[in-house]
Amino acid sequence: DTAEITTENGQPVCVASLNRSFGHPAYTGRLRVIRAGDSLYLVNILPVEEYLKGVVPSEMPASYASEALKSQTVCARSYAFTAIQNPKYSFADLNDSTACQVYMNQNTDPRTDNAVESTAGEVLSFHQQIASAKYFSSSCGSLSSDDDVWTYPDTGQGDSYMTARLETEPPTLCALSSEAAFVDFILHPEADTYLEASDPWFRWQVTLSMTTIRSNISELFARRMAADPKRFTLLSSDG
């Protein structure tokens, strides 16, 4: 069962039952309510360029420099189009959380609106295809190769343009395959060379019991093996 909500004059529709960081969000376009079993899903139907006006200020502070906002916009637009080409959901192209891109967690802003409008239609591409522009809010200073995180079911490989490297200026290749190199990288980073060194999540600590660590690793390995068994080699009890 579905129902659609629109306004006669095209004004945004405020959803008072939702709370975001700035209050109750108001959505442009059409709102579709879908009932599936005991759940209700609220789907916002609107053009990509209007969608981006709700994404960019939610993913990057509107106070950032205009060129940074434009870069974020191009990444967000590229991500959105690749998601539309490869939908995860039966009733929508994306969701509004960090599982895709955060949408309408911050109100729209003239500065981010301008970034969207001034880059209209611009995307990242690789070999004439729109690139899947995955991005993040914080890291330890190192990027991973796409093969290490995401792979395509038909090839078992990721996107070749996403390669492992350190987030330095200029970028440098990763050399963290040995235990000693990784420990040194974590404990003694050259803070002035990493772009995110001032971020509070650049380095952090947590204490876990060995039981919890074993349980977490076993669960994660089991899930990854089920999803992509070809990437694992099992060691038998006899070596």
Identify what each model region corresponds to:
Residues D1-G239:
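Conserved, single-site charged/polar hotspot
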